[in-house]
Amino acid sequence: MTDPIADYLTRLRNAIKAKHKIVEIPASNLKKEITKILCNKGYIWDYRFIEDKHQGKIKIAMKYSNINKVNAIKVLKRISKPGLRKYTSYRKMSRVLNGLGIAILSTSKGVMTDKEARDLKIGGEVLCYIY
């Protein structure tokens, strides 16, 4: 697999379209950090890391509204790709959907949202947009 982040986002996108309540994704440290951010920001209900003989799995409980079963996540968009990396400084960082969405960045201080990176005044690689 050449792009594990794109695979992660695609699995989430497919689970949303199929209205799955739980999705299992192969684990990595970067995917674990992205999952923690999604849970903290309220895009997913819960997550659990399952260890096995290989790399482990992340079990994610998707978040849907009670009324019309609409998911909390509307768009998952990969920005920086293996063939074309996108980096930004904290000064040039734009807000996602005027602050309604989040950008997830990989920085020297770890994986964080665009707001956290702006507060710490550090830039990094823009992994994806979520809104």
Curated annotation (Swiss-Prot):
The keyword Zinc is annotated on this UniProt entry: no
Gene Ontology cellular component annotations, sorted alphabetically: ribonucleoprotein complex; ribosome
Biological process annotations from GO: translation
Pfam families: Ribosomal_S8
InterPro entries from the UniProt entry: Ribosomal_uS8, Ribosomal_uS8_CS, Ribosomal_uS8_sf
Subunit structure: Part of the 30S ribosomal subunit. Contacts proteins S5 and S12.
HAMAP family linked: Ribosomal_uS8_B
The protein's name: Small ribosomal subunit protein uS8
Native species: Azobacteroides pseudotrichonymphae genomovar. CFP2
